[in-house]
């Protein structure tokens, strides 16, 4: 019988504070430009809120951008029509970031690193358009709050705060699981106006988060960014293996070659996946799955196009104008 310590599936120490300026500069030059190109600067379906409200439908003119043609209305009327939108730049977005110990685990890079890059990218995209961003961080508890603000300097502050070590995490009981509902409930009093909310988590959490998520979605535009890893649903055949729970610190010795164990794990993964999708759908929340081995530009581009396609199909069937936004929960 083989015995190995898995190098990729054990929990790593919490990441050290990042160089916020270096990270943001890299994202601006290498990622944000690619995203601009992939979406042609049109972020409807990703950045929601007042700035996406449909203002008017009118006949197409030679100078109009063909990307704004409403093909459903055009087909019904037989004349090309374009959509015009309100240019409301006063959108507020909040990032609710679950960096509990399981976020420090990953096959090649950690979920925490992926989450931080996503927040930095989206925060800069939003502030570049004149919007304001804020954040809450959860490790063992909600231990960091960044009030909403605008501008590049504010984004640097936000990145720096989220990446700082947590004194509360060190003081918390070692055998406590994630309580995502605490993060969702802590956000409620901070969001006094309709906002864009990104909930970043692996959703490996204790029960009770579904209702707080639904309450958030009743007042705000919520996207669940589910942080995953290629090893989440796989059990490598490595013989006897000592595995640990990143949340509680508990360890157990298992035989990864046991077919019965592998079948039970597969069923558990399928059941958990179905439960998550049902919870997102019930809450009316669209979910973006972001793996540690994903290209973030490709993931975001696919998400945006899918939301637009679903939204256009819904509005076409209803006989109304397509707004480019998906119905809530349609992607779950």
Residue ranges and their predicted role:
Residues 1-46, 59-64, 73, 82-120, ...:
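Exposed, interaction-prone extracellular/peripheral surfaces
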Residues 56:
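Acidic, metal-associated active-site segment
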Residues 67-77:
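N-terminal low-complexity, intrinsically disordered segments
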């Amino acid at each position: 019988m083989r015995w190995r310590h898995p190098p990729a599936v054990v929990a790593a120490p919490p990441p050290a504070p990042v160089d916020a300026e270096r990270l943001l500069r890299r994202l601006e030059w290498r990622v944000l430009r690619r995203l601009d190109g992939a979406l042609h600067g049109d972020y409807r379906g990703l950045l929601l809120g007042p700035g996406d409200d449909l203002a008017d439908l009118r006949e197409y003119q030679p100078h109009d951008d063909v990307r704004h043609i409403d093909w459903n209305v055009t087909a019904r009327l037989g004349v090309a029509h374009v959509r015009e939108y309100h240019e409301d730049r006063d959108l507020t977005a909040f990032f609710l970031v679950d960096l509990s110990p399981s976020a420090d685990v990953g096959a090649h890079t950690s979920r925490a690193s992926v989450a931080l890059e996503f927040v930095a990218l989206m925060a800069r995209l939003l502030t570049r358009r004149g919007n304001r961003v804020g954040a809450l961080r959860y490790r063992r508890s909600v231990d960091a709050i960044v009030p909403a603000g605008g501008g590049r300097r504010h984004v640097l502050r936000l990145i720096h705060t989220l990446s700082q070590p947590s004194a509360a995490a060190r003081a918390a009981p070692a055998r406590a699981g994630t309580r995502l509902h605490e993060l969702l409930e802590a956000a409620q009093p901070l969001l006094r106006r309709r906002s864009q909310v990104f909930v970043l988590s692996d959703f490996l959490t204790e029960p009770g988060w579904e209702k707080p998520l639904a309450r958030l979605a009743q007042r705000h535009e919520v996207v669940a960014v589910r942080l995953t890893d290629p090893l989440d649903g796989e059990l490598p055949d490595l013989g006897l293996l000592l595995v640990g729970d990143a949340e509680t610190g508990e360890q157990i010795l298992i035989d990864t070659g046991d077919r019965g164990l592998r079948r039970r794990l597969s069923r558990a993964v399928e059941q958990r996946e179905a439960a998550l999708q049902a919870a997102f759908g019930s809450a009316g929340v669209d979910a973006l799955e972001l793996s540690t081995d994903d290209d973030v530009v490709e993931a975001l581009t696919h998400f945006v196009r899918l939301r637009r396609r679903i939204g256009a199909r819904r509005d076409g069937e209803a006989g109304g104008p397509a707004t480019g936004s998906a119905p809530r929960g349609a992607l779950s």
